[in-house]
């Protein structure tokens, strides 16, 4: 009875019961669907589409559609969806997040809602974290969709414009979050409708949703062009800052991730630079460079935050340990790090278009996600994205043992204990996966294991290419694998090893070549006797190894440091105990670890000191684990507050972006061009009358001469009017007279050029000016945001001030757009029609050659003499790179 009451009170348990009723319906249909021939089964797609056309809902056909996908998967892939996978599919269709543990088959789960929603013909996007997974899943799961008559597209780095357009027209499109976001930005820089690649954003399923929507939430996608600033000052400050003394000339706050120069430090820098006052208005650029150089030297650590590879500074993802190619820190920080490391400095950039993942994914009509760890961030998913989290039960009971944390006084003592633990388990043959938080720590541990003669594999950002292969074999007998954080997500660790990987490797050694596509799909190209014999041999070997590994307790996970997010720790633990396998996990910590040092080691340190505990003597108690988790919760809450605060500022910019992009799209497709221009002319006339003949001022004091000069310059060139012609008119009469004259001039211009040419001129001019003004507005808003925090000292709410001033700046930008459009419309000289073929070729090229505080994902910078990324066919310096009279 008590259990019943507990379940009744448990929201998640109630959800599972609701889902089970739908699963029962699907299971009842299984015999009927299984009896169908291939032709009849494949014909169900047309039947479903016909029923939808007649008004039936997706929910109405869900049980049958899911039963069809389950049977198609069984026939094509040899994989039948478990009941819990059906539950996950229902949750995804409902636009929620399904939390499913590692190894529960999330990739297969997605086929159910993807097929169902693709039947509408509006497109479904499946979003993965990297190109490898996008390729693998589109090839692997694509077999099911193609069997059922759906088309499958793939969006990865390096595709040209036509390939992208074709992929987006498919029923199902796989790709990475970066590519989807950049394509959205590029579509909003297009100059012709046929340059658009994306359709309306309908339905997206985000794999590893926590990684993309939370870890990367504040990361802006940026398309940028080169600015004209010199890089000399970065080298200057890279020489100055190392001569400053920590805690004397500057103070570092690791918890807040800030560094502040002291008055002593300011005096030293002024002397070295030979300036009288560093904070004089003329020296603003110097203070900016000093601040970035201090951050680069005091906060950013090589082999933790970034690596230097092939003469480039490459950011390391703090959550996955992967190298983030193409991503750069903004605001000059990346250049400061390049100067610190003595590599070539890339020029600073100017933002052409930008959006955050938070704002991009909120534009989808329906959004869903799946991950192994979402429950800890349930509040954030709900508040920011409106997404509920449903925890799906495992197919088999979870029998993994999570051992209490052990904590040491020093980091050295901790790593000595980790090595002893690895050695003991390795001696028995039990496979061990060790998680570290940085490349530096993984290589230090690797060195200690080498000294002990323990064979092992290292998987970190430096060895990214081998990732899937190393992770797949981490469950072999006696295997020791060191992995930076969560590298290798998306690849299952099979106890005993993966026979297909082993067979392919052996084939390579024998000189055979495996086809890339077949390899991605998990089926090698070599289907001859040699491959089959090898596969059979390795299957027997891995089955025997699996039996022995299970007897030894399965894969053992060792965490060498607690991450500030419990979710990341849970992801590491989740690498073992898949599908009911045995496994165990334990975290080793020290009082010198970042989390313990910054967030709550005082109590534990006090206990250890009072007890006189030696540095090699650990404390192991459930209370310690709870204390660490309490520290993690404090950090998580702080990070959530930061993300929520940032989003409040982003929302201001997002509303402006949506309005500009919506109006830009109407111009692009040629909607109401003439009406828009005539309305702009009327607005410009009204604004001019308000300026030169303001209300409440006596007519004798009106500046009619200035009004006519303004009209000549803007909306009535060559008018031949004098102030006497306007004398005696009221404000309303002035406005009506000037509007009528300017519209007559517009009509004459249209008659001279022809209506079709006039529409094309209007479209191109409006697009160019909107893009140019929007680019400047982005920079201005960025600068406003940088300094707005200081308003708090004047007892003003910075967010309210930002909204108010941002709105004023936006209105000024709109007025400036209207003025420039009207001015250019009356003055443009037509030499020859714009050749769309040329601009289309430029668009294809820009797709083929793809570029905070938070690191920004950038496309490669646009050089001054490169084709402009807007697709105009002009050089960047002659187009979006500067204001241009068309």
UniProtKB/Swiss-Prot annotation:
Cofactor binding note of this UniProt entry: May bind 1 zinc ion per subunit.
GO term, biological process aspect, one: intracellular protein transmembrane transport
Keyword Methyltransferase carried by entry: no
Domain of life: Bacteria
Record-linked InterPro entries: Helicase_ATP-bd (IPR014001), P-loop_NTPase (IPR027417), SEC_C_motif (IPR004027), SecA (IPR000185), SecA_CS (IPR020937), SecA_DEAD (IPR011115), SecA_motor_DEAD (IPR014018), SecA_preprotein_X-link_dom (IPR011130)
UniProt topology in membrane: Peripheral membrane protein
Molecular function terms from GO: ATP binding; metal ion binding; protein-exporting ATPase activity
Cofactor entry: Zn(2+)
Composition bias, Basic and acidic residues: 841-864
One GO cellular component term: cell envelope Sec protein transport complex
Alphabetized Pfam families for the sequence: P-loop_SecA, SEC-C, SecA_DEAD, SecA_PP_bind, SecA_SW
Family statement drawn from the similarity comment of this UniProt entry: Belongs to the SecA family.
Name listed for the protein in its UniProt record: Protein translocase subunit SecA
Origin species: Pelotomaculum thermopropionicum (strain DSM 13744 / JCM 10971 / SI)
């Amino acid at each position: 009875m008590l259990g019943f009451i507990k379940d009744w009170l448990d929201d998640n348990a109630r959800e599972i019961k609701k889902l089970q009723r739908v699963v029962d319906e699907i299971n009842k249909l299984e015999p009927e669907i299984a009896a169908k021939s291939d032709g009849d089964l494949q014909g169900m797609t047309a039947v479903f589409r016909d029923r939808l056309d007649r008004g039936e809902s997706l929910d109405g056909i869900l049980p049958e559609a899911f039963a069809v996908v389950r049977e198609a998967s069984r026939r094509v892939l040899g994989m039948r969806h478990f009941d819990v996978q059906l539950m996950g599919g229902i949750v995804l269709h409902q636009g929620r997040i399904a939390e499913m543990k590692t190894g529960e088959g999330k990739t297969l789960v997605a086929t159910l809602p993807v097929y169902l929603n693709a039947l509408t013909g509006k497109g479904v996007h499946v979003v993965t974290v990297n190109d490898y997974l996008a390729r693998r899943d589109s090839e692997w799961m694509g077999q099911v969709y193609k069997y059922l008559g759906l088309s499958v597209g793939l969006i990865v780095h390096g595709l040209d414009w036509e390939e992208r357009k074709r992929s987006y027209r498919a029923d199902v499109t796989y790709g990475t979050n970066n590519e989807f976001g950049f394509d959205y930005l590029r579509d909003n820089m297009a100059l012709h409708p046929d340059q658009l690649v994306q359709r309306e954003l309908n339905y997206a399923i985000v794999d590893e949703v926590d990684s993309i929507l939370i870890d990367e939430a504040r990361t802006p996608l940026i398309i940028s062009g080169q600015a004209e600033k010199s890089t000399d000052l970065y080298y200057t400050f890279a020489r100055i800052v190392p001569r400053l003394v920590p805690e004397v000339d500057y103070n570092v706050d690791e918890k807040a991730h800030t560094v502040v120069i002291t008055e002593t430090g300011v005096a030293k820098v002024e002397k070295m630079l030979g300036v009288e006052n560093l904070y004089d208005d003329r020296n603003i650029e110097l203070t900016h460079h000093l601040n970035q150089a201090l951050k680069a030297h005091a906060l950013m650590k090589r082999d933790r935050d970034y690596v230097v590879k092939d003469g480039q500074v490459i950011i390391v993802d703090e959550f996955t340990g992967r190298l983030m190619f193409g991503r750069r820190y903004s605001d000059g920080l990346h250049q400061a790090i390049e100067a610190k490391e003595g590599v070539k400095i890339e020029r600073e950039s100017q933002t052409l278009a930008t959006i955050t993942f938070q704002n991009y994914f909120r534009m989808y009509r329906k959004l869903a996600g799946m991950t192994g760890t979402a429950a800890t961030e349930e509040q954030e998913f709900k508040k920011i994205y409106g997404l509920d989290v449903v925890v799906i039960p495992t197919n088999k009971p979870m029998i993994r043992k999570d051992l209490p944390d052990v904590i040491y006084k020093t980091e050295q003592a901790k790593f000595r204990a980790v090595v002893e633990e690895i050695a003991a388990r390795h001696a028995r043959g039990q496979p061990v996966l060790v998680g570290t938080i940085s490349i530096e720590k993984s290589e230090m541990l690797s060195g200690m294991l080498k000294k002990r003669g323990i064979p092992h594999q290292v998987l970190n950002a430096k060895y990214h290419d081998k990732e899937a292969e190393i992770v797949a074999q981490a469950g072999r007998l006696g295997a020791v694998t060191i992995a930076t954080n969560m590298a290798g997500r998306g690849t299952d660790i099979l106890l005993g090893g993966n026979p297909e990987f082993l067979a392919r490797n052996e084939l390579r050694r024998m000189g055979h070549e495996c086809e890339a596509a077949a390899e991605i799909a998990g089926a090698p190209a070599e289907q001859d006797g040699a491959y089959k014999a090898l596969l059979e041999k390795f299957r027997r070997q891995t089955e025997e190894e699996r039996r022995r590994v299970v007897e030894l307790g399965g894969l053992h996970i060792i965490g060498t440091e607690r991450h500030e997010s419990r979710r990341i720790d849970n992801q590491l633990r989740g690498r073992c105990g898949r599908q009911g396998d045995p496994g165990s996990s334990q975290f080793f910590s020290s009082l010198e670890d970042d989390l313990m040092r910054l967030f709550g080691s005082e109590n534990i340190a006090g206990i250890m000191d009072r007890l006189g505990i030696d540095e090699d003597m650990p404390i192991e108690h459930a209370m310690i684990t709870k204390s660490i988790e309490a520290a993690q919760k404090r950090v998580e809450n702080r990070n959530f507050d930061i993300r929520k605060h940032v989003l409040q500022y982003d929302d201001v910019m997002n509303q402006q972006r949506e309005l500009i992009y919506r109006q830009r799209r109407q111009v692009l497709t040629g909607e109401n061009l003439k009406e828009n221009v005539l309305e702009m002319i009327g607005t410009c006339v009204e604004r001019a009358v308000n300026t030169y003949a303001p209300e409440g001022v006596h007519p004798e004091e009106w500046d009619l001469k200035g009004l006519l000069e303004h009209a000549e310059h803007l909306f009535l060139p060559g008018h031949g009017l004098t102030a006497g012609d306007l004398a005696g008119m009221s404000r309303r009469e002035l406005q009506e007279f000037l509007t009528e004259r300017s519209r007559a001039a517009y009509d004459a211009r249209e008659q001279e050029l022809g209506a079709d040419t006039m529409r094309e001129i209007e479209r191109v001019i409006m697009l160019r000016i909107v893009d140019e003004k929007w680019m400047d507005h982005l920079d201005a808003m960025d600068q406003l945001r940088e300094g707005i925090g200081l308003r708090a000292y004047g007892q003003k709410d910075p967010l309210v001030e930002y909204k108010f001033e941002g709105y004023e700046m936006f209105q000024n930008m709109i007025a400036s757009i209207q003025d420039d459009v009207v001015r250019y419309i009356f003055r443009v000289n037509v030499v020859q029609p714009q050749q769309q073929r040329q601009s289309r070729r430029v668009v294809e090229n820009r797709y083929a050659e793809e570029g905070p505080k938070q690191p920004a994902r950038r496309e490669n910078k646009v050089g001054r003499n490169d084709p402009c990324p807007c697709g105009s066919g002009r050089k960047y310096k002659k187009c979006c790179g500067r204001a241009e009279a068309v």
